[in-house]
Amino acid sequence: MKTGSEFHVGIVGLGSMGMGAALSCVRAGLSTWGADLNSNACATLKEAGACGVSDNAATFAEKLDALLVLVVNATQVKQVLFGEKGVAQHLKPGTAVMVSSTIASADAQEIATALAGFGLEMLDAPVSGGAVKAANGEMTVMASGSDIAFERLAPVLEAVAGKVYRIGSEPGLGSTVKIIHQLLAGVHIAAGAEAMALAARAGIPLDVMYDVVTNAAGNSWMFENRMRHVVDGDYTPHSAVDIFVKDLGLVADTAKALHFPLPLASTALNMFTSASNAGYGKEDDSAVIKIFSGITLPGAKS
């Protein structure tokens, strides 16, 4: 198996997670290629040592041993792979495709079947950990797929992941685990926002409330990470409100298919949907706190 600079990997989607993954591949010594519609992101990756960048991965597809797709949703994944300028038709048979977007299990299965038609192996491999862990090559990967897919993607997984969980051999299982994880993530953010909103209404300084919770049993990773943005009055999007409208929608769809009630997740989805409807969809997901009326939130620090 190829290793180091002999191994060519392309990353499609150079947002916070995709850029982190791409930079991790560069640091690991892999010959790294990147594609994104954002020319600034492409320039950043090229300056960091990528072999090449483009707004379309098809331009370098034939060079690749593996492709990592980390875009927003299933529609974008399908467009990248099978659209008018889709990359799948340009990849060498046997190339491994790691789909790391948060998508429905059924979409993962459909994409895997379509890729197989091109002689390509797919690893259903959604990721978590946030931008910092992505940048440090320490993402958590929830993966399902064939032994061949895992083997062919080993250099990429070693470069980008701190932990790799092998969920099973069938595409779709990894996506299901990620969707369940997103249930918890969304509920934690919504609950944190509700708690901080109540503190604001009660006249408790939010920096004090934050300090207490992060040093007590009620803390969670999402509270500590996202409610810091509220305290700082900084809603620059690291993960936007609309992402959780999408992800909690996938949670709801999964539960509906299984005839399973999810009262907390349903409430969280309603909260994020309300925030999006109020015009906060492109802000950081912590902006869900803005749906509460009658409170004063901290402003951005100069």
UniProtKB/Swiss-Prot annotation:
The active site is at K178. It is an enzyme of class 1 (oxidoreductase). Disulfide bonds: none annotated. One of its GO terms (molecular function) is NAD binding. One of its GO terms (biological process) is organic acid catabolic process. Pfam families: NAD_binding_11, NAD_binding_2. The keyword Transferase does not apply. Signal peptide: none annotated. It catalyses: L-threonate + NAD(+) = 2-dehydro-L-erythronate + NADH + H(+). Keywords: Carbohydrate metabolism, NAD, NADP, Oxidoreductase. The keyword Secreted does not apply. Gene3D superfamilies: N-(1-d-carboxylethyl)-l-norvaline Dehydrogenase, domain 2, NAD(P)-binding Rossmann-like Domain. NAD(+) binds at residues 7-35, 102, 246. InterPro entries: 3-OH-isobutyrate_DH-rel_CS, 6-PGluconate_DH-like_C_sf, 6PGD_dom2, 6PGDH_NADP-bd, HIBADH-like_NADP-bd, HIBADH-related, LtnD, NAD(P)-bd_dom_sf. Its EC number is 1.1.1.411. It comes from the Bacteria. Belongs to the HIBADH-related family. L-threonate dehydrogenase subfamily. Catalyzes oxidation of L-threonate to 2-oxo-tetronate. Can use either NAD(+) or NADP(+) as cosubstrate, with a preference for NAD(+). PANTHER family: 3-HYDROXYISOBUTYRATE DEHYDROGENASE-LIKE 1, MITOCHONDRIAL-RELATED, L-THREONATE DEHYDROGENASE. This is L-threonate dehydrogenase. It comes from Escherichia coli O6:H1 (strain CFT073 / ATCC 700928 / UPEC).
